[in-house]
């Protein structure tokens, strides 16, 4: 391993003009891999729509929308709910749901902090390989 990075380095291989050989051996933690078979449908749809491979941040956004949708179902809010009440009920509902997302299994603690496990990847031959 040449260097180690956090999830913020996910997507480094897709940076325009980046010499991917410079990332060879990079170890990083990320909850998403575009090369994971379980994400194949999302990756294809994303590539068809945007012409590039999605990174963790695209997957986080996708999971975030689905998490809010699940929390809305859990809270059972009517369309005309007061925004302050909606916020309180959604905050409570988030602590009761589990979402199977592109970035893994997501749960929220009583402070509203998401809980999910990252996976270690190494860049080898220009690809993310699970470490």
Language-model features, listed with the residues they occupy:
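Extracytosolic ligand-binding ectodomains
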Residues: 1-131
